[in-house]
Design a protein with these regions (language model features):
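Mid-length scaffold segments of soluble, non-membrane domains
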Residues: 89-143
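Short structured motifs
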Residues: 52-53, 86, 101-102
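Primarily secretory-pathway and cell-envelope proteins
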Residues: 2-83, 139-201
Length: 201
């Protein structure tokens, strides 16, 4: 599969592939390249961010998944229910939308994703979150106009638990779970777990 991917600059060495940006567009075989975690071109690279860009990469079957996201910190604020209101759509991070890259077909929170690039949004609630996955990846994080939502590919519902550990900074990590993987979202004293598994081609 070949997809049109918009990049703001030259990208080299995507898992062994050299990709060149011409007029802002790169032709990247999504079955080969996960892609790098890049800032939006409107955000100057030399400016320090309060919520730095981070990534986590994990194996799923014979493929891999990469999650790129901004990491906001609590800074003595009440996060869920105040800073991040319950039952309202959230970009699941900060700045750019949280992006998911996969080079094989997977299910994330029950939503089937073919190889490609996606954005992840959430509606947090006290005991469960709704995860929205969209094919729109070139917008700013809080740009939720109809054109963005029209590209939704699915919604998954996952449990939200309270933990004894306190996470000052929003963190996305991965934990093995038998034949699948758990994508774990933690911030403040909230822990949300979404299952990720390989789907047979």
């Amino acid at each position: 599969m070949i997809r049109l991917i918009f990049w703001p600059t030259l990208v080299l060495g995507l898992t062994g592939l050299t990709a060149f940006v011409l007029t802002g567009i790169t032709l990247v075989p999504t079955t080969v390249a996960l892609g790098p975690c890049l800032r939006d071109f409107t955000s100057p690279f030399w400016e320090e961010r309060a919520s730095p860009l981070a990534s986590t990469t994990f194996e799923v079957g014979d493929g891999a998944v990469r999650v790129c996201y901004g990491r906001p910190s609590a800074r003595e604020r009440v996060v869920f229910g105040e800073l991040i209101p319950y039952r309202q759509l959230w970009r699941t991070g900060a700045n750019e939308p949280t992006r998911i890259y996969t080079n094989r077909t997977i299910e994330l929170a029950g939503v089937r994703l073919v190889p490609g690039r996606y954005s992840l949004y959430a509606i947090p609630d006290t005991n469960q979150w709704r995860l929205f996955i969209t094919e729109s990846v070139t917008h700013w994080g809080n740009d939720l106009r109809s054109g963005t939502r029209d590209k939704d590919v699915g919604v998954g519902i996952v449990p939200a638990d309270t933990t004894a550990d306190y996470f000052e900074t929003f963190t996305i990590s991965a934990e093995p779970a038998g034949d699948s993987t758990l994508m774990v979202l933690e911030w403040e004293r909230t822990r949300v777990v979404a299952g990720v598994r390989a789907v047979r081609r």
